[in-house]
C-alpha cells in the first residue's frame, strides 16, 4: 500500500468518525501535512509516481525523498489523524 492509499484510508476513517465529508477532512490533513509539518505532500506523491525517473536522473533527491517518506510513514498519518480527532472532540465538548 503506497502513501496515497494509506492517506486516503486514514482520511476515510477520520471522516466516518467525525461525520464530516471526505473533502473537508482531506483539506484538514493536507493543511497539517503541508503547512505545519513542513512536509511537501506533492513531493511525496510525485515520488511514488515517478520513482524510476528520479532514480535515473537524481539519486541524491530520491535519497532525500525516501528518508522523508520513511520518517512520515504511517506513524505521521496516525499522529495527524489523532490531532484532527482531538480538535473535533474538543469542539463537541465546548458545545455541551
Say what each PLM segment does.
Residues 1-96:
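Positively charged, phosphate-engaging catalytic surfaces used for nucleic-acid and nucleotide handling
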Amino acid at each position: 500500500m503506497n502513501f496515497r492509499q494509506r492517506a486516503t484510508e486514514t482520511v476515510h476513517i477520520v471522516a466516518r468518525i467525525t461525520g464530516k465529508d471526505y473533502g473537508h477532512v482531506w483539506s484538514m490533513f493536507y493543511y497539517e501535512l503541508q503547512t505545519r509539518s513542513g512536509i511537501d505532500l506533492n513531493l511525496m506523491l510525485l515520488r511514488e509516481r515517478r520513482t524510476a525517473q528520479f532514480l535515473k536522473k537524481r539519486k541524491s533527491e530520491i535519497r532525500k525523498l525516501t528518508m522523508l517518506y520513511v520518517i512520515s510513514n504511517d506513524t505521521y498519518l496516525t499522529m495527524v489523524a489523532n490531532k484532527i480527532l482531538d480538535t473535533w472532540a474538543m469542539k463537541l465538548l465546548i458545545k455541551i
